[in-house]
Curated annotation (Swiss-Prot):
<keyword id="KW-0520">NAD</keyword>
<dbReference type="GO" id="GO:0006006">
    <property type="term" value="P:glucose metabolic process"/>
</dbReference>
<keyword id="KW-0324">Glycolysis</keyword>
<dbReference type="InterPro" id="IPR020828">
    <property type="entry name" value="GlycerAld_3-P_DH_NAD(P)-bd"/>
</dbReference>
<comment type="pathway">
    <text>Carbohydrate degradation; glycolysis; pyruvate from D-glyceraldehyde 3-phosphate: step 1/5.</text>
</comment>
<comment type="subunit">
    <text>Homotetramer.</text>
</comment>
<dbReference type="InterPro" id="IPR036291">
    <property type="entry name" value="NAD(P)-bd_dom_sf"/>
</dbReference>
<feature type="binding site">
    <location>
        <position position="233"/>
    </location>
    <ligand>
        <name>D-glyceraldehyde 3-phosphate</name>
    </ligand>
</feature>
<dbReference type="GO" id="GO:0050661">
    <property type="term" value="F:NADP binding"/>
</dbReference>
<dbReference type="InterPro" id="IPR006424">
    <property type="entry name" value="Glyceraldehyde-3-P_DH_1"/>
</dbReference>
<dbReference type="GO" id="GO:0006096">
    <property type="term" value="P:glycolytic process"/>
</dbReference>
<keyword id="KW-0963">Cytoplasm</keyword>
<dbReference type="GO" id="GO:0004365">
    <property type="term" value="F:glyceraldehyde-3-phosphate dehydrogenase (NAD+) (phosphorylating) activity"/>
</dbReference>
<dbReference type="Pfam" id="PF02800">
    <property type="entry name" value="Gp_dh_C"/>
</dbReference>
<keyword id="KW-0560">Oxidoreductase</keyword>
<feature type="site" description="Activates thiol group during catalysis">
    <location>
        <position position="178"/>
    </location>
</feature>
<dbReference type="InterPro" id="IPR020830">
    <property type="entry name" value="GlycerAld_3-P_DH_AS"/>
</dbReference>
Length: 337
């Protein structure tokens, strides 16, 4: 039986999580809350998407609900998470995708409305973080609020895990060349905490900070303190790429590195870590449901212990698919607890 889910925040990730949920089979979205989008506008925003294209099915309103392919979804417009009637709507698990309620204390407010568990679709300062294919075994049913980490951590961690398990990572630096996101400005505007981040997104390559590499140490404890990184925001709408430079404990040829990544992509990390030897560019990964796709032809070894590895990710679609996978996993664990 499909897990009943509510979505708080119908922005980029909220909408793409819903698209993924409709494809997933194990996830049944029964309610959406967004105080800034009325029902008619919700239909429009879900139906038309500049990046992923028009939704192929029928989207309409009926009796105050959002109806997709004949399936009714309750819609609320509460600003206070504690006031959202998740329980009444039948939502056991809530995807917190506003980007605002990212701590345990704030995300826990959803529990007051009847939700049983909250999955934050962003990194969290204090909630346990999980990355599919990396540390799901650490999940405990008593957790009420968990985080799906960031899209970049979801790309980096599976790759780092394979390399670390096979050759050992002494240390590493990561750069993510990252597509534009909703927090950026179309033209120069005020951004008091991040001056560079306030510059026009369409006109610039913008250096930015990211905690994605350090967060790998939270999901792979043996890598704690061994990785850090930065981001370049670039003028594309979606798809990003991780550039990971690592020093290895155990020497390996680039062919050996490719071999273990390919094996993992066909085995224990199938569907999460992909592998390609094609001459690909970013748009080739639009709509990719994998967390990370290793680009075998783009990497460069300097010697047998120092190597640059490249991996692509659809920072919207692939990440949203993992949100659905994480919910399906924890729901199964919760039922068997």
């Amino acid at each position: 039986m499909a897990t009943k889910v509510g979505i708080n925040g119908f922005g980029r990730i909220g909408r793409i999580v819903l698209r993924n949920a409709l494809e997933h089979g194990d996830i049944d979205v029964v309610a959406i809350n967004d105080p800034f989008i009325d029902l008619d506008y919700m239909v429009y925003m879900f139906k038309y998407d500049s990046t992923h294209g028009r939704f192929k099915g029928k989207v309409e309103t009926k009796d105050g609900k959002l109806v997709i392919e004949g399936k009714p979804i309750s819609v609320f417009g509460e600003r206070d998470p504690a006031a959202i009637p998740w329980g009444k709507a039948g939502a056991d698990y809530v995807v917190e995708s506003t980007g605002v309620f990212t701590t345990i204390e704030k995300a826990s407010l959803h529990l007051k409305g009847g939700a049983k568990k909250v999955i934050i679709s962003a990194p969290s300062a204090d909630a346990p973080m999980f990355v599919c294919g990396v540390n799901l075994e650490a999940y405990k049913p008593e957790y009420e609020v968990i985080s799906n980490a960031s899209c970049t951590t979801n790309c980096l961690a599976p790759l780092a895990k394979v390399i670390h398990d096979n050759f050992g990572i002494v240390e590493g630096l990561m750069t993510t060349v990252h597509a534009t996101t909703a927090t950026q400005k179309t033209v120069d505007g005020p951004s008091h905490k991040d001056w560079r981040g306030g510059r026009g997104a369409a006109a610039n390559i913008i250096p930015s900070s990211t905690g994605a590499a350090k967060a790998v140490g939270k999901v792979i404890p043996s890598l704690n303190g061994k990785l850090t990184g930065m981001s370049f925001r670039i003028p594309t709408s979606d798809v990003s790429v991780v550039d990971l430079v690592v020093r290895l404990e155990k020497g390996a040829s680039y062919d050996q590195i490719k071999e273990v990544i390919k094996k993992a992509s066909e085995g224990e990390l199938k569907g999460i870590l992909g592998y390609t030897e094609d001459e690909v560019v970013s748009t080739d990964f639009l709509g990719s449901t994998e967390s990370s796709v290793f680009d075998a032809k783009a990497g460069i070894p300097l010697n047998d212990k120092f190597v640059k590895l490249i991996s692509w990710y659809d920072n919207e679609y692939g990440y949203s698919r993992r949100v659905c996978d994480l919910i399906a996993y924890v729901a199964k664990k919760d039922k068997s607890a």
